């Protein structure tokens, strides 16, 4: 797999306060990487760095040449007083034909929404339209910030299934910020646990056993996910039907105290 984005000892400071400390990571073509961490851990800042919206204070950021990034924001604020249907919304970021818009919407199962009012979409419908907008660019890297926020449980399952299918269809990298721990563990290749620095990173099966993960998310999260692993690993497959890997995990032993996840 080839690296699309590489961070080496990257730091970001605001008013002498270090928000990101010595971050080293890679986003690879064809892989889903999920970022987790408590509120105020620097997750949004890291996303901005990768999108090119925040300059690092120090360290190195390397992106593949001509890298195309599709971005699905956590929240989309639209002026309620301005009528805006889906096809007009999709064309705000560029000029696309009706067929191109239909094709993108069809990929996410939302072609029937092309003439719908953006203000009347459900949480799940809204996320699918945002995903379609990102796919219009045929991205090499898809960045999703809390993609399942405001979506019901079944909608979350469907959305993560969709993201996984998009990864395979486009052979793109996916970088996702999420707090839906159960669903994340089933659908991701790698997990990065962030609390200003990288506390631990690696495969889902090993990350949940690490003391840094337990310190951030508590024993309840570990026990709940232990049940998830027991329920699925005895079949040697995760929820997506893929074999469970035993990849090694790289972790650092920092004491964080107990925090609630966002």
From Swiss-Prot:
Q: Which Pfam families match?
A: ABC_tran
Which cellular component appears as one GO term in the record? Answer: plasma membrane
Main EC class of this protein?
translocase
Q: Could you give a GO molecular-function term held by this entry? A: ABC-type zinc transporter activity
Q: Which residues form the ABC transporter domain?
A: 5-220
Supply the EC number(s). Answer: 7.2.2.20
Subcellular location per UniProt equals: Cell inner membrane
* Catalyzed reactions per annotation: Zn(2+)(out) + ATP(in) + H2O(in) = Zn(2+)(in) + ADP(in) + phosphate(in) + H(+)(in)
- Positions with a binding annotation for ATP: 37-44
Q: What is its main location?
A: membrane
Annotated region Disordered: where?
Answer: 236-262
Which InterPro entries is this protein grouped with?
Answer: AAA+_ATPase (IPR003593), ABC_transporter-like_ATP-bd (IPR003439), Metal_Ion_Import_ABC (IPR050153), P-loop_NTPase (IPR027417)
Keyword field contains Membrane: yes
Positions the record marks as coiled coil are none
Name the membrane topology term: Peripheral membrane protein
Q: What's the domain of life for this entry?
A: Bacteria
A GO biological-process term: response to zinc ion
The free-text function statement in the UniProt record for this protein reads: Part of the ABC transporter complex ZnuABC involved in zinc import. Responsible for energy coupling to the transport system.
> Which family does the entry's similarity section mention?
Belongs to the ABC transporter superfamily. Zinc importer (TC 3.A.1.15.5) family.
| Description of how the protein assembles with itself and partners | The complex is composed of two ATP-binding proteins (ZnuC), two transmembrane proteins (ZnuB) and a solute-binding protein (ZnuA).
- Protein name stated in the entry: Zinc import ATP-binding protein ZnuC
**What is the organism lineage in this UniProt record?**
Bacteria, Pseudomonadati, Pseudomonadota, Gammaproteobacteria, Vibrionales
């Amino acid at each position: 797999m080839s690296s699309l984005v590489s961070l080496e000892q990257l730091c970001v400071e605001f008013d002498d306060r270090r928000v990101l400390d010595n971050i080293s990571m890679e986003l690879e073509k064809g892989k889903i990487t999920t970022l987790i961490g408590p509120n105020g851990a620097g997750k949004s800042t890291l996303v901005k760095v990768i999108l090119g919206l925040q300059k690092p204070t120090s360290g190195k950021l390397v992106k593949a040449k001509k890298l195309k990034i599709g971005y699905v924001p956590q929240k989309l604020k639209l002026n309620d007083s301005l009528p805006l249907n889906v096809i007009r919304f999709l064309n705000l970021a560029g000029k696309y034909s009706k067929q191109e818009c239909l094709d993108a919407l069809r990929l996410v199962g939302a072609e029937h929404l092309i003439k719908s009012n953006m203000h009347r979409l459900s949480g799940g419908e809204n996320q699918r339209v945002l995903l379609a907008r990102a796919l219009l660019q045929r991205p090499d890297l898809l960045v999703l910030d809390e993609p399942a926020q405001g979506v019901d449980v079944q909608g979350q399952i469907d959305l993560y299934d969709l993201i996984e299918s998009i990864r395979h269809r486009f052979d793109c990298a996916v970088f996702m910020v999420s707090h839906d721990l159960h669903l994340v563990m089933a659908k991701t290749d790698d997990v990065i646990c962030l609390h200003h620095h990288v506390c631990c990173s690696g495969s889902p099966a090993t990350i949940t056993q690490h003391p840094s993960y337990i310190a951030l998310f508590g024993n309840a999260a570990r026990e709940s996910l232990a049940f998830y692993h027991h329920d699925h690993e005895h079949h040697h497959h995760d929820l997506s039907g893929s074999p469970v890997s035993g990849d090694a995990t790289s972790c650092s032993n920092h004491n964080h105290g107990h925090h609630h996840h966002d």
